[in-house]
Amino acid sequence: MRAHLQAVMPYELHGTPYYQLVLVPDGEQRPQQARLSHDMIYADPRPGDAVEVHAILGIIDRVERAPAEES
């Protein structure tokens, strides 16, 4: 699913970097939250980024930067 990051909150747990994300799927208004380790998301995520969200059984397991749309 395609979405936009609304908030990105980095934190560390037992020495491992994680991110708490608030994202809004395209075409929806209700935000969703996800917590992912640094290896499940691209480097330096920022609010406003367009992303491609991958989930298994409704659980987000990977977030990639969405390719730029051509005009």
Model regions and ranges:
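Short aromatic-glycine-enriched beta-strand elements
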Residues: E12-L23
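Short coil-to-beta-strand transition motifs
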Residues: M1-H4
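Short, flexible beta-strand-to-coil junctions
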Residues: V24-E28, I56-G58
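Loop/turn positions that initiate beta-strands
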Residues: G48-A50
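Beta-strand/loop nucleic-acid-binding surfaces
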Residues: E28-P45
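OB-fold/S1-family single-stranded nucleic acid-binding modules
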Residues: I56-S71
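Residue-level recognition of beta-strand microenvironments
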Residues: V8-P10
